Amino acid sequence: GKAHEEGFPVRGEEQTVHVPCEFKEGEYTLVYRLSQPDREGEVRVTGKLMIPPLPWVGNRIGVTNEVLSPWSPLAYSGKGVIGCWNRSYTFDGPFLSQAANGGNPILRAPIRLSALIDGTDHPLTTTSTQSDMQRPDRAETSGKAVFQGTPLKVAWSNWMEYDGLTVATVALEPPPEGLTIDRLSLTMPLRPDIVKYLRGTRHMGALRNGRLPWDGKVWRRGFEPYLWVSNEYEGFLYFCESEANWVHPDGAQDLLVVKGGEDAGIALNLIS
């Protein structure tokens, strides 16, 4: 087949390089040669790479906007209310102000993002909202917001799919002279009886199976990409794909805080 050759400068004792590859079926020979301009000879390492048949690559099987059974199409009631199968979500900007499961409220108060600056807590307040998409399978909204009493500018977007998944993105723009945020916290207040069992978190590079031990009062951890709180009948699941743009001291163990009782809920300290 066609040979491809490319050189890479060596920087340090360990280095990762990306070798161009068309990723097509077949057997590839990889040859690594290490040489130094002022020395004769080279170190040569050869390896084989076998790419098996990949008949699914590039096809569109299963890619559809169809609402699959038993879910139902999204229902739009206005004023930020969107219904999905057995549930109703009410949005205030990027976050839920209420979610009801079978008519039972899950949140005991709206989800809240707040910035602590110079000892004062400034809540995020939505100033504009626009609907960007309203399909049976997916809803998209976006808008602007402010942290009351600060010069921070905020742009946000949110999308929801017919299975009840909702994802929010919030971008903060500081003033030209800069601004110090002592803490940025996202609080999800939940109905106390829902915060009974904990599941999720990482274990040896994978998601942990089974329930997590906790005393039902306070549970603290560093960054975790996934946490599910529940009782025997209902639950609330949070996930974040990475801790990119989270700012915290190394080893911090208060980035994810779960509380039970009257203060039940999940709190994320994005900046601490």
What are these language model-derived features?
Residues 2-12:
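Solvent-exposed serine/threonine-rich low-complexity stretches and specific carbohydrate-binding patches
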Residues 45-49:
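C-terminal edge beta-strand
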Residues 2-4, 44, 106:
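Local beta-strand/beta-hairpin segments that build beta-sheet-rich folds
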Residues 10-12, 18-27, 36, 50-272:
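Beta-strand/loop-rich accessory regions of lumenal/periplasmic or secreted enzymes
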